[in-house]
């Protein structure tokens, strides 16, 4: 069994925030979806990083590991005797993918639907044939080399920004998104898109923070009508700008 502190690259007397930051960086670096050409090694490292995080991020498990090391992680003390309360002390590791999703607030940064297109759900039947937009079958994040924000700086995942121009004749005039983490495991992403529908300028903002989704739609940029969707529940709010 590898030394969990060495796996995360942290010292023994580090703060919980340092452990979370180390996990975030290494989990993103070794995620199997990001390493298709080295998947076997990536899966091994990804699993190892998840196990190290599960132990060192939990105060009780970390205390047992600090005192008994590998024997503690396997549920036996230094002299080879089992702990009196195996349920409390034996480390049961979860699926590393589950640890990864939980860390990022239930969202998967490697999934296209993580950012999605809120206009598809909000506008629906309001969009005519000219206003509809076709998209290719390949996911947006299928190849990280084609997505600058997820390129060389993706391993730190501290901040990011990407912008796109028109994506075709569908009327989408602009799209940008930003994302980041504060180092404590919380995650926030925001995307903004502008589209012309029936001659009207529709601007949509979508914010996902720690698993909570908020969508805001503005019509013609006059702030006279806003449609909010919070966790798939739509709410209408009219604001008097006079």
UniProtKB/Swiss-Prot annotation:
It comes from the Eukaryota. The keyword Glycosyltransferase does not apply. Keywords: Chaperone. GO terms for biological process: chaperone-mediated protein folding. SMART domains: DnaJ (SM00271). Gene3D superfamilies: DnaJ domain. Testis specific. Residues 1-69 form the J domain. CDD domains: DnaJ (cd06257). The keyword Chaperone applies. GO terms for molecular function: Hsp70 protein binding; unfolded protein binding. PANTHER family: DNAJ HOMOLOG SUBFAMILY B MEMBER 2, SIMILAR TO DNAJ HOMOLOG SUBFAMILY B MEMBER 6 (HEAT SHOCK PROTEIN J2) (HSJ-2) (MRJ) (MDJ4). May operate as a co-chaperone of the male germ cell- and haploid stage-specific Hsp70 proteins. This is DnaJ homolog subfamily B member 3. It comes from Macaca fuscata fuscata (Japanese macaque).
């Amino acid at each position: 069994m590898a030394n969990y502190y060495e796996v995360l690259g942290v010292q023994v007397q580090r703060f919980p925030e340092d452990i979370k930051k180390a996990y975030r960086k290494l989990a993103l670096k070794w995620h199997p979806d990001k390493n298709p050409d080295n998947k076997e090694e990536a899966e091994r490292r990804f699993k190892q990083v998840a196990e190290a995080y599960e132990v060192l991020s939990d105060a009780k498990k970390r205390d047992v590991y600090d005192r008994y090391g590998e024997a503690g992680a396997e549920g036996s003390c230094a002299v080879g005797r089992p702990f009196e309360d195996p349920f409390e002390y034996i480390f049961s590791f979860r699926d590393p993918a589950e640890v990864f999703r939980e860390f990022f607030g239930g969202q998967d940064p490697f999934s296209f639907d993580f950012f999605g297109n809120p206009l598809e759900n909000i506008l629906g039947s309001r969009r005519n044939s000219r206003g509809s937009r076709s998209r290719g079958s390949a996911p947006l994040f299928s190849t990280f080399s084609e997505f600058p924000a997820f390129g060389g700086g993706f391993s730190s995942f501290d901040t990011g920004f990407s912008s796109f121009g028109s994506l075709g004749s569908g009327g989408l005039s602009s799209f940008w998104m930003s994302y980041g983490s504060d180092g404590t495991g919380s995650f926030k992403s925001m995307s903004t898109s502008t589209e012309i529908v029936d001659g009207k300028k529709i601007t949509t903002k979508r914010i996902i923070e720690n698993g909570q989704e908020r969508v805001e739609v503005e019509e013609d940029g006059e702030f006279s009508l806003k449609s909010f969707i919070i966790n798939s529940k739509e709410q209408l709010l009219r604001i008097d700008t006079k």
